[in-house]
């Protein structure tokens, strides 16, 4: 049957419309699965690994698997760690307490069931200070746990390579922590006055520190005794009084002194008589009137009388009594040297013995800082070495030298006594005051040292605040020798690390506030 031109045109229109509709159906059918499945990563994610980041953790880059430049957020696992997935396995990395210490832990699961056997992992922890720590993982229960504990502060990045069962290549997982970081802007840093310096080598004196106590200088301390028994008539001196040499401390009525003065007076009278007799006999002997025997006898008597007077005088001098007095029994007890009366055991009307300790007098212009040296430190403390004395209850400081080190160790304590002699013109060092004695040796070059004021005590641990991007991190350190200005860092800090050298106490206060707010 012949088809007219109108019929041909109608058929062509129908075919065209049907083709367009079919193409639309095909196009819509191709895009629907992609919309339902999210995004295809057959080329960009050949390993089907899922990457991302938690809001509190640092960004990570995965250029190889993210060939399209996409960025994904890390999923949070059921244990609060970062969750990664591949080949049906879920790997969560985080921290957990074990045996009282924090450790890095890996939780591996497949289809919701924990998998530990057949999984191996190694890793590396890098701190904000640049220090790195290799990590080895062992199976612990239904997870893998680092053999090495992780010390505070928990500000670090961890990368671990996890080998899964049946996998040809390890899965890289990452964890970032910023617990305890003190965040400060440049303006805040300027307002707080915190000064940042670089840790490096310095010269410090090899020294050792001892607890000590200020004591009387025993070379200038005396127990004053009367040396004659008697009754106290007056006591013009008082405890705490500064006295001069020869000043009267007490007056005692002594019968013994009366006898000695009487003996002197009698000896002087006998001497006068012997001198007159000798002069007369000498003249007669010169005139050939007196015999030689009489002259020699008179001269001998004179010499004996002189000896008796000298003996009586020296007895009085030995007890500190004057040769003459208005009262023969009056004994004036005088200060043997200038000093302060620190003890007094005498009162008016009291009968005292000749050996009674009635006063203790000490010249406090010089005192001793005594300390005890253990057997292991005896070789480090030598006579003549420089020492620094610091009061435990005030800001008083003084420098001196070691004046004595005991040559014998105590039988029970196994320690030796040592002391530093200090001048005390202002009487700032009082006997009984507890002090700290730092004994210094020769200068020693140490690889890492910081300012002494940079070291803060946080929960009984020495800490230096290290400058990191955006703030500071409290870094535990082990300190060594110090000269009072700089202190050696034995562990915990590397040369070149930037730290808070001045006003670090501000950071300590901020750390305390943060701990109180977060309960950490």
UniProtKB/Swiss-Prot annotation:
<comment type="similarity">
    <text>Belongs to the membrane fusion protein (MFP) (TC 8.A.1) family.</text>
</comment>
<dbReference type="Pfam" id="PF00529">
    <property type="entry name" value="CusB_dom_1"/>
</dbReference>
<keyword id="KW-0614">Plasmid</keyword>
<dbReference type="GO" id="GO:0046686">
    <property type="term" value="P:response to cadmium ion"/>
</dbReference>
<comment type="function">
    <text>CzcA and CzcB together would act in zinc efflux nearly as effectively as the complete czc efflux system (CzcABC). The CzcB protein is thought to funnel zinc cations to the CzcA transport protein.</text>
</comment>
<dbReference type="Pfam" id="PF16576">
    <property type="entry name" value="HlyD_D23"/>
</dbReference>
<keyword id="KW-0813">Transport</keyword>
<feature type="region of interest" description="Disordered">
    <location>
        <begin position="28"/>
        <end position="85"/>
    </location>
</feature>
<dbReference type="GO" id="GO:0046873">
    <property type="term" value="F:metal ion transmembrane transporter activity"/>
</dbReference>
<dbReference type="InterPro" id="IPR043602">
    <property type="entry name" value="CusB-like_dom_1"/>
</dbReference>
<dbReference type="GO" id="GO:0060003">
    <property type="term" value="P:copper ion export"/>
</dbReference>
<dbReference type="InterPro" id="IPR051909">
    <property type="entry name" value="MFP_Cation_Efflux"/>
</dbReference>
<dbReference type="GO" id="GO:0016020">
    <property type="term" value="C:membrane"/>
</dbReference>
<protein>
    <recommendedName>
        <fullName>Cation efflux system protein CzcB</fullName>
    </recommendedName>
</protein>
<keyword id="KW-0862">Zinc</keyword>
<dbReference type="InterPro" id="IPR032317">
    <property type="entry name" value="CusB_D23"/>
</dbReference>
<keyword id="KW-0105">Cadmium resistance</keyword>
<dbReference type="InterPro" id="IPR005695">
    <property type="entry name" value="Co/Zn/Cd_resistance_CzcB-like"/>
</dbReference>
<dbReference type="GO" id="GO:0015679">
    <property type="term" value="P:plasma membrane copper ion transport"/>
</dbReference>
<feature type="compositionally biased region" description="Basic and acidic residues">
    <location>
        <begin position="32"/>
        <end position="76"/>
    </location>
</feature>
<dbReference type="GO" id="GO:0030288">
    <property type="term" value="C:outer membrane-bounded periplasmic space"/>
</dbReference>
<dbReference type="GO" id="GO:0046914">
    <property type="term" value="F:transition metal ion binding"/>
</dbReference>
<dbReference type="InterPro" id="IPR006143">
    <property type="entry name" value="RND_pump_MFP"/>
</dbReference>
<keyword id="KW-0170">Cobalt</keyword>
């Amino acid at each position: 049957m012949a088809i007219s031109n109108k019929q041909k045109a109608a058929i062509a229109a129908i075919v065209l419309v049907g083709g367009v509709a079919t193409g639309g159906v095909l196009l819509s059918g191709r895009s629907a699965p992609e919309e339902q499945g999210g995004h295809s990563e057959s080329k960009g994610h050949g390993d089907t690994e899922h990457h991302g980041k938690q809001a509190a953790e640092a960004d990570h880059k995965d250029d190889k698997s993210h060939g399209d430049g996409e960025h994904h957020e890390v999923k949070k696992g059921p244990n609060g760690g970062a969750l990664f997935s591949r080949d049906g396995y879920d790997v969560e990395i985080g921290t957990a307490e074990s045996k009282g210490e924090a450790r890095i832990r890996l939780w591996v699961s497949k289809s919701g069931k924990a998998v530990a056997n057949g999984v191996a992992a190694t890793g590396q922890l890098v701190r904000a200070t640049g220090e790195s720590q290799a990590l080895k993982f062992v199976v612990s229960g239904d997870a893998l746990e680092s053999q090495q504990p992780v010390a505070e502060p928990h500000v670090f990045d961890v990368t671990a390579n996890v080998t899964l069962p049946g996998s040809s290549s390890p899965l890289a997982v990452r964890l970032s922590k910023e617990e305890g970081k003190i965040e400060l802007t440049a303006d805040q840093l300027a307002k707080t006055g915190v000064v940042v310096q670089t840790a490096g080598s310095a010269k410090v004196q090899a020294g050792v520190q001892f607890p000590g106590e200020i004591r009387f200088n025993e070379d200038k301390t005396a127990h004053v005794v009367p040396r004659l028994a008697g009754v106290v008539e007056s006591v013009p001196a008082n405890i705490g009084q500064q006295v001069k040499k020869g000043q009267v401390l007490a007056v005692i009525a002594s019968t013994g002194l009366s006898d000695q003065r009487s003996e002197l007076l009698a000896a002087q009278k006998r001497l006068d008589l012997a001198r007159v007799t000798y002069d007369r006999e000498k003249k007669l002997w010169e005139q050939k009137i007196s015999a030689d025997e009489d002259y020699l006898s008179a001269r001998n008597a004179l010499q004996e009388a002189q000896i008796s007077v000298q003996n009586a005088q020296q007895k009085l001098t030995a007890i500190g009594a004057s040769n003459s007095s208005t009262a023969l029994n009056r004994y004036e007890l005088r200060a043997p040297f200038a000093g302060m009366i620190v003890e007094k055991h005498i009162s008016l009307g009291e009968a005292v013995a000749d050996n009674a300790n009635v006063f203790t007098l000490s010249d406090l212009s010089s005192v001793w800082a005594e300390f005890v040296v253990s057997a292991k430190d005896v070789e480090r403390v030598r006579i003549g070495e420089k020492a620094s004395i610091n009061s435990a209850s005030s800001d008083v400081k003084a420098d001196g030298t070691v004046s004595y080190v005991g040559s014998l160790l105590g039988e029970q304590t196994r320690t030796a006594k040592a002391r530093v002699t200090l001048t005390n013109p202002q009487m700032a060092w009082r006997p009984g005051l507890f002090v700290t004695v730092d004994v210094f040796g020769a200068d020693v070059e140490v690889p890492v040292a910081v300012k002494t004021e940079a070291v803060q005590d946080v929960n009984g641990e020495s800490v230096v605040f290290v400058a990191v991007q955006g703030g500071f991190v409290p870094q535990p350190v082990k300190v060594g020798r110090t000269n009072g200005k700089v202190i050696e860092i034995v562990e915990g800090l590397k040369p070149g690390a930037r730290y808070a050298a001045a006003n670090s106490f501000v950071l300590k206060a901020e750390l305390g506030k943060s701990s109180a707010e977060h309960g950490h």
